Regions:
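Ordered, amphipathic secondary-structure segments that act as subunit-interaction surfaces
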Residues: 69-119
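Extended, well-folded interaction surfaces typified by the phenylalanyl-tRNA synthetase beta subunit core
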Residues: 8-9, 14-16, 20, 24, ...
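Short Lys/Arg-rich amphipathic alpha-helical segments
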Residues: 20-22, 30, 34-48
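Short amphipathic alpha-helices in soluble, non-transmembrane regions
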Residues: 85-94, 130-140, 192-193
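Helix N-cap motif at beta-to-alpha junctions
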Residues: 78-83, 124-127, 182
Length: 229
């Protein structure tokens, strides 16, 4: 049984963010969650001062345009509340595109989160086995170089990729990848998209509406690849 610190107790919520909500910014997510948890009438701990706010901490914020089955938020409570009761109160104020799936008092910290799994789905104009094989060849290289964001410098993201495998699924190429989620070395899955576009020609059709891709975050892990919670 988890021993809850009565003086500083955080309740952890795992939640999904799908559909149109993939396009809201992290700041908008924080604002939305703030409204929801206030409506849920949870026994929240508030900061002191002229503008008291509840203590909310999020793990590995997503980029705009990424769906997720695995988001985490820690809320500091002023007193104990049963996790299932807290989850029910919050979900009553949520849409189907964002729902709490688990609530519990954690024994881990967000700094213990080391890996996250993703599914990247590409729908090119033309698909064949050679293109799938090329994706796997490029992803298996010892050096996987991409341009840094807003920079002309390159970086090798190979150490931040635990695994990445491309397969053909119907008219799509699906890449299942486990990427670093370490707060000091977080790898945005958009870098995998950028790399495959540059090296394999994915998403390079002159008609920008002809091809598309989707990213779904699936799960989170400790350093030993046991499920994070």
């Amino acid at each position: 049984m988890v021993q809850v610190n009565q003086t500083k107790q955080f309740l952890r919520f795992k939640f999904i963010k799908r559909g149109s909500l993939q396009y809201i910014s992290h700041l908008d997510l924080v604002r939305t969650m703030h409204k929801v948890i206030v409506r849920a009438k949870l026994p929240l701990w508030y900061t002191e001062g002229f503008n008291p706010k509840p203590k909310m901490i999020f793990a590995a914020p997503l980029s705009i345009g990424t769906e997720s089955e695995c988001e985490f938020m820690d809320l500091r409570m002023n007193e104990y509340i049963d996790p299932s009761e807290a989850m029910a109160r919050i979900n009553a104020n949520m849409t189907s595109e964002m729902q709490i799936t688990e609530a519990y008092y954690p024994e881990s910290k967000f700094t213990d989160l080391k890996w996250m799994s993703y599914r990247l789905s590409f729908t090119p104009v033309e698909i064949n086995d050679d293109l799938v094989n090329l994706c796997n060849e490029m992803l298996s290289l010892d050096t996987v170089e991409v341009l840094k964001k807003n920079s002309e410098q390159t970086m090798n993201i190979r150490p931040l990729i635990k695994s990445a495998l491309a397969t053909r699924v119907g008219d799509s190429i699906v890449v299942d990848a486990v990427l670093s989620a370490d707060p000091s070395a977080f790898l945005n899955p958009e870098y995998i998209v950028k790399y495959l576009k540059d090296k394999c020609g994915l998403l390079s059709h002159p008609d920008l509406t002809a091809e598309h891709y989707e990213i779904m975050r699936l799960n989170a892990y400790f350093g030993d690849m046991t499920e994070f919670r």
